[in-house]
């Protein structure tokens, strides 16, 4: 795999990434990998596939509903909900990479994937996950400005600045995804063609990578880790100042209202960070464990599933927007029935 980065005169960055349809494994050219999955029994494979499909559809519906509410309701046209809509989009795209492919493999009992398909999974999942970290960082900065500098909020968090922060988050995510993919697939593999996972993820591919060729992989991984640590530090500092400011509010009602806007974001960030750290910071081993696959399920499914629930559970604005949407749909349905009843 080759990755070329071109810097244009106008400041634009162009990526040219090419992935070969075959790689070298133990001096033998191969064209794909095999997933280990959760079971070797065909019936259990089908059950697992259907279970994942139900979870996937539920996550998609919840995130699409939240995106629809934010888009249609005028009261939700604020920077906080703009970031939340982009977070839901990233969650939606992120979970759509591994789960549909796993469902198809479970139904067809075919656990193989091509080199191009595996590289695409690594690129997309790394891009969306990295972009989500930066969007979460932008959301913490938004809450910091709203609570610690409310008089300057409209100027600092203008629509142009919000679009810029989200655009930079997506762009950095794509760039990191390209670096990860190039680092992994630019060198030959020395292990088995069986990936001890149900999708192509970086730790599993590290298990079958040449130990003496891991310098390129760890270099690209180190860049992402450093940027991730910068994001974590920014979020921690933001909430340190937020909590210090909130505790100075004289009334309990004011403190509760301020905490209510921050705790959902902090909860989402903690879940995302905890699951990602377990999966990606764990030292790769040569033995596959069912525990690793179960935690990968939590990493790929849990944050996208819980994010809409956490943000709407105690959010009166989202609940009000949902009631308005239901009333509009019911009124349109009643009007349609009335027109049909009085028609010729």
Locations of the language-model features?
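Transmembrane helical core of 7TM receptor-like proteins
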Residues: 1-344
């Amino acid at each position: 795999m080759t990755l070329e980065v071109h810097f244009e005169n106008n400041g634009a960055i162009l990526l040219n990434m090419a992935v070969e349809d075959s790689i070298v494994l133990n001096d033998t050219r191969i064209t794909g990998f095999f997933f280990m999955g959760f079971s070797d029994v065909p019936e259990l494979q089908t059950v697992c596939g259907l279970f994942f499909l139900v979870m996937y559809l539920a996550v998609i519906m919840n995130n699409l509903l939240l995106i629809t509410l934010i888009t249609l309701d005028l009261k939700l046209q604020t920077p906080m909900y703009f970031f939340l809509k982009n977070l839901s989009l990233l969650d939606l795209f992120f979970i759509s990479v591994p789960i549909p492919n796993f469902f198809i493999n479970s139904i067809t009992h075919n656990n193989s994937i091509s080199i191009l398909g595996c590289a695409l999974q690594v690129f997309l999942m790394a891009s969306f996950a990295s972009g989500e970290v930066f969007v979460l960082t932008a959301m913490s900065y938004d809450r910091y400005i709203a609570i610690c500098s409310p008089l300057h909020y409209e100027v600092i968090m203008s629509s142009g600045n919000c679009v810029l922060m989200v655009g930079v988050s997506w762009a950095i995510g794509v760039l990191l995804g390209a670096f990860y993919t190039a680092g992994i697939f630019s060198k030959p593999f020395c292990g088995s063609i069986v990936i001890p996972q149900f999708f192509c993820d970086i730790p599993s591919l590290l298990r079958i990578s040449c130990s003496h060729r891991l310098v390129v992989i760890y270099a690209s991984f180190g860049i992402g880790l450093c940027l991730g640590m910068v994001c974590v530090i920014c979020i921690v500092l933001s909430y340190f100042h937020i909590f210090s400011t909130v505790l100075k509010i004289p009334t309990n009602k004011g403190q509760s209202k301020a905490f209510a806007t921050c705790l959902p974001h902090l909860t989402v960030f903690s879940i995302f960070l905890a699951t990602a750290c377990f999966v990606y910071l764990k030292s790769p081993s040569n033995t596959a464990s069912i525990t690793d696959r179960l935690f990968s399920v939590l990493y790929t499914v849990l944050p996208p599933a819980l994010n809409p629930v956490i943000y709407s559970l105690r959010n009166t604005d989202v609940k009000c927007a949902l009631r308005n949407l239901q009333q509009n749909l019911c009124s349109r349905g009643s009007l349609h029935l009335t027109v049909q009843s009085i028609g010729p």
